Each structure stands twice: as structure tokens, then as C-alpha cells.
From Swiss-Prot:
It is a single-pass membrane protein. It comes from the Bacteria. This is Protein TrbI. Disruption phenotype: Expresses approximately normal numbers of F pili that are unusually long, remains plasmid transfer proficient, displays increased resistance to F-pilus-specific phage. Resistant to phage R17 and M13, conjugates at lower efficiency (about 10% of wild-type), resistant to CdiA-CT toxin. Keywords: Cell inner membrane, Cell membrane, Membrane, Plasmid, Transmembrane, Transmembrane helix. May influence the kinetics of pilus outgrowth and/or retraction. Overexpression phenocopies the deletion mutation; i.e. causes resistance to F-pilus-specific phage and CdiA-CT toxin. The chain crosses the membrane at residues 18-40. It is found in: Cell inner membrane. It comes from Escherichia coli (strain K12). Disulfide bonds: none annotated.
Length: 128
């Protein structure tokens, strides 16, 4: 009789492990999904809009009011271009963002034009 009881004990032991294995695996899958979601959410870049045309037009309007020679005008344009690129790059790196020009955005992306224009002005004042 002991030989017939032994397989029953092994089967009962396996069932006991089954009840702990399934919830444990489900918990691991849920934890893995939560960690994966968090990693993706933290690393996903933010999309913002920048009105390049308005910024460049404002610069050229301001520059046209000054009496500058052609060489001075070229130097000022080069400084503006350098300040514009540096400002956009710095903002993009600081905020882990994708910057799109305003016409490419239908809605929903915050506009950073004013912030970039202020940074360009600060950079232009700082450079000789």
C-alpha cells in the first residue's frame, strides 16, 4: 500500500508548487512590464514647436534698421546664426526634446519660440 501512496504524494507536492509558480510568474511579468514602461516613458523625447520664420524675420527687421556695412551685416548674421544653432542645441539637450518648426505641428506641442528668442538675445549681447 505504501507503493501506491508514494505517487499520490509526489503529485500533491507538484500541485503545491504549481499554486506558487503561476502567481510568482505573473508577478514577475507585471513587474517587468512596469519597469519597461517606466524606462520607455523616461527616455521618450518631448516634442516642441519653434517658430523659426518669426525669429529670423524679427532679426532681419532689427538688423535692417541699423546702418551697417556689408561686412558688418555678414558678421552680425553669422553671430545670429551661431547663437540660434547653439540655443536650439542647448535647449534640445537640456530637455531631451525634438524641436519641430511651427508649420510642421498641427497642435499639441508647446511653443518654445519666446524662450529661444530670449536665449539668442542673451547670447548676442554676450558675444563681442
Amino acid at each position: 500500500m505504501s507503493s501506491t501512496q508514494k505517487p499520490a504524494d509526489v503529485t500533491a507536492e507538484r500541485r503545491s508548487h504549481w499554486w506558487w509558480t503561476v502567481p510568482g510568474c505573473l508577478a514577475m511579468v507585471l513587474l517587468n512590464a512596469a519597469v519597461s514602461y517606466g524606462i520607455v516613458r523616461l527616455n521618450a523625447p518631448v516634442t516642441v514647436a519653434f517658430n523659426m520664420k518669426q525669429t529670423v524675420d524679427a532679426f532681419f527687421d532689427s538688423a535692417s534698421q541699423k546702418q551697417l556695412s556689408e561686412a558688418q551685416s555678414k558678421a552680425l548674421s553669422a553671430r545670429f546664426n551661431t547663437a540660434l544653432e547653439a540655443s536650439l542645441q542647448a535647449w534640445q539637450q537640456k530637455h531631451h526634446a525634438v524641436i519641430l518648426v511651427s508649420p510642421a505641428v498641427v497642435q499639441g506641442a508647446p511653443d518654445i519660440s519666446r524662450e529661444i528668442q530670449q536665449d539668442i538675445a542673451r547670447r548676442m549681447r554676450a558675444e563681442p
